[in-house]
Curated annotation (Swiss-Prot):
Annotated site, Interaction with substrate tRNA, chain positions: 124, 146
A molecular function GO annotation: ATP binding
Protein family according to the UniProt entry: Belongs to the IPP transferase family.
Protein name: tRNA dimethylallyltransferase
The gene coding this protein: miaA
Keywords from the UniProt entry: ATP-binding, Magnesium, Nucleotide-binding, Transferase, tRNA processing
Assembly and interaction partners: Monomer.
Top class in the EC scheme: transferase
E.C. no: 2.5.1.75
Chain residues that bind ATP: 33-40
Length: 414
């Protein structure tokens, strides 16, 4: 067993000795894993045990009518396996990390009151980091300021907000991409509301739900073999194309006043379909509630999806841009479709790569708060750490553990 700061890692032997098969009534479990790794199947099994309630930790599942591309459980599955924080906003709305943390805090209390263990399951690692490592105390948005900034963005474009940010918060201006609508808008809102740059707020001490002295947090990171995961990703994408991801995006454009910079439209899969629809000059962009120019400008200079397909994508892009027909020819459309699928596959693999990086970061969490060390516990007992000592010490500390398969995580939780 190793102990580091406020957090503790347990060996496999320690797990079986001190934790299995039961978790404490005040437990909170985070099941963290990359996309397509089998989290949902395990979550369903755990729900059937009667011990858990499910809380989604997925920034894409919050959106209504975005089902195929997010691998969201269907209506029948959601009825049988209820998930908190699924289908809570429309695709043109935003949902901040702070809002997520506040919602989770409320839901954890509710689960415990119901005699259940909250199982936080999903792949949005930024959400997990906010829960486990904390958020800087940036003030919540003021509705009037938000409306003012949104009107400014609509009138003058995100570039105007980005230029303004450069004058009032050089650190954020340098850190953010000029097209990152959500974060630029938020940074401007914070400055107008507080007269303090968001970069200053972000340097202040963090506050994490996992520090709650009345709860026992277990953070489980499942990091499967990458070749196995890549095969699973390909299989999942094949299912999405067959189930109608392109049709789903067209339906979203028909029913919502979307823009290409919205967080929902930057989700992996949806972004690539949008680009495909632009390249094939799809008539959906003639909808009166859509700004066609915004979409075409957003994809005017698309990047090849990977080094391996760079030459192929360049040829495809050339064919698409040279057509003068109202709609792309069948051949050009087929090429654009292949490009879309290539890019979606590459983007999903890159997402998984980032998730692995985040998981490793989570497993290195530490806190400088003064707590007993392994040596001090040992010295105060005998030559070894007894089970009672460990039980006393592990109380109200975040327990970190990593697995290479979902089956190992299952054995920990069932």
């Amino acid at each position: 067993m190793t102990i580091k700061g406020k957090y503790m890692r347990l060996s496999s032997d320690s797990l079986s000795s001190y934790l299995s098969p039961n978790l404490a009534d005040n437990s909170v479990v985070c099941l963290m894993a990359p996309t397509a790794s089998g989290k949902t199947a395990l979550a369903y099994e755990l729900y059937n045990s009667g011990r858990y309630e499910l809380i989604s930790v997925d920034s894409a599942l919050v959106y209504r009518d975005m089902t195929v591309g997010t691998a969201k459980p269907n209506a029948a599955e959601l009825a049988r396996y209820p998930h908190h924080l699924v289908d809570i906003i429309d695709p043109m709305q935003s949902y901040s990390v702070a809002e997520f943390v506040n919602d989770v805090a409320r839901l954890i209390d509710s689960c415990h009151q119901n005699g259940k263990i909250p199982l936080l399951v999903g792949g949005t690692m930024m959400y997990y980091m906010a829960l486990l490592d904390g958020l800087s105390p940036v003030p919540d948005s003021d509705d009037s300021v938000r409306a003012r900034v949104e009107q400014w963005r609509q009138d003058e474009g995100i570039s105007a907000l980005y230029d303004y940010l450069g004058k009032v918060d050089a650190i954020s201006h340098e850190r953010l991409n000029a097209t990152d609508t959500q974060r630029i808008t938020r940074a401007v809102e914070v400055y107008l509301q507080t007269d303090i740059p968001i970069s200053d707020w972000q340097r202040q001490p963090k506050q994490a739900l996992a520090y709650n002295p009345n709860q026992q947090w277990h953070a489980l990171a499942v990091m499967p073999d990458r070749p196995w995961l890549h095969t699973r990703i390909e299989q999942r994408l094949d299912i999405m194309w067959r189930e109608g991801l392109v049709a789903e995006v067209i339906s979203l454009l028909e029913h919502y006043p979307l823009t290409p910079g919205l967080p929902s439209m930057r989700c992996v899969g949806y972004r690539q379909v949008l680009e495909y629809l632009v390249q094939t000059n799809h008539p959906v962009f003639e909808q009166p509630h859509l700004d066609k120019a915004q979409f075409y400008d957003a994809f005017a200079q698309s990047e090849p999806s990977s080094n391996e397909s760079k030459e192929q994508d360049t040829t495809i892009q050339s064919s698409i841009t040279q057509t003068h027909l109202p709609m792309a020819t069948a051949q050009t459309e087929a090429l654009a479709c292949q490009q879309m699928q290539n890019k979606a596959l590459y983007a999903t693999r890159q997402l998984a790569k980032r998730q692995y990086t985040w998981l490793r970061k989570v497993m290195q969490l530490s806190n400088t708060a003064a707590v007993p060390t392994t040596e001090s516990i040992t010295a105060s007992s005998t030559s070894t750490v007894g089970s009672d000592d460990v039980t006393d010490f592990q109380k109200n500390k975040l327990i970190l553990h990593s697995f290479s398969t979902m089956e190992q995580a299952r054995a920990y939780l069932v």
